[in-house]
Regions:
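Conserved non-catalytic scaffold segment of RNase H-like nuclease domains
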Residues: 2-110
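Active-site flanking residues adjacent to catalytic metal/cofactor-binding acidic residues
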Residues: 7, 132, 170
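Short, glycine/acidic-enriched loop or turn micro-motifs at the edges of active sites
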Residues: 11-13, 136, 174
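Conserved protein kinase catalytic core
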Residues: 14-16, 139, 177
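Active-site-proximal helix-loop-helix substrate-binding element of RNase H-like nuclease domains
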Residues: 63-66, 73, 136-170
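Alpha-helical transmembrane segments that form the membrane-embedded catalytic/substrate-binding core
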Residues: 168-178
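Acidic two-metal-ion nuclease catalytic site recognized across multiple nuclease folds
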Residues: 177-219
Length: 219
């Protein structure tokens, strides 16, 4: 059976002096959150793991943003360990991965290769064809060509953000909720449709307006 998995990662910053040749990137993963959905887009299971970075450090800004501390990540598994756990959780077989933007796929792919993690056991995760950028999907549905925030997309879908943003599992849950509503209502534009209906309802036809003005006037 094919798995539908929503993934969200949180990252810390790698200072320039630590961006060695074997890791020439600005960010490093410190948390992976994932939600599994069935074929009807109902949430069936959840996964979350902190990740111990090899090069990056959590500064004050990242700690305030994510709520993740140095202590939490120092006791966490490496990226390879966290990914092994996640892949075991997903199970064998085909999978479709949903994320909010392409960042998650790009960062995961970069780190797997830079840290020389066995690519064969991560093959399903490294295949770009298995990933859906739902930020792009939502942008097209709502006619917004710019990079929509998840919070804005939820608003357009007439939904509220649940929990604190910038927690990998919380963001994955909210993305999954949005996906479920949009996929179950493929023709709906939600807030935009309702506003258009109200606009049309409140707009009096020109003919009716003229008729009202001329009513009772003898010509």
């Amino acid at each position: 059976m094919k798995s539908n998995v929503v993934i969200d990662i949180e990252m810390c910053i790698v200072q320039k002096e630590y961006q060695w040749k074997e890791y020439p990137y600005e960010h490093e993963i410190i948390q992976i959150g994932a939600v599994m959905m069935d074929e009807g887009y109902e949430i069936t299971d959840e996964f979350s793991s902190y990740v111990r970075p090899k090069y990056g450090r959590i500064d004050h800004f990242i700690q305030e943003l994510t709520g993740i501390s140095d202590k939490q990540i120092m006791e966490a598994p490496t990226l390879e360990g966290a990914l092994d756990r996640m892949m075991s959780w997903i199970g064998s077989g085909e999978a479709t991965f949903y994320s909010w933007s392409k960042t998650d796929f790009v960062q995961i792919s970069r780190e797997i290769r830079a840290k020389e993690i066995d690519e064969e056991k991560m093959a399903v995760l490294l295949d770009k064809e298995n990933w859906v950028d739902y930020q792009q999907t939502a942008g097209k549905r709502f006619g917004k060509p710019w990079r929509m925030s998840l919070e804005d997309a939820l608003m357009f879908a007439e939904m509220e953000l649940e929990g604190k943003q910038h927690d990998g599992l919380v963001d994955a849950r909210n993305t999954a909720r949005l996906i479920a509503k949009m996929e179950k209502n493929p023709e709906s534009h939600f807030l935009q449709d309702r506003l258009q209906e109200e606009k049309e309802k409140n707009a009096e036809p020109l003919g009716t307006s003229l008729g009202s003005l001329l009513n009772g006037i003898r010509l």
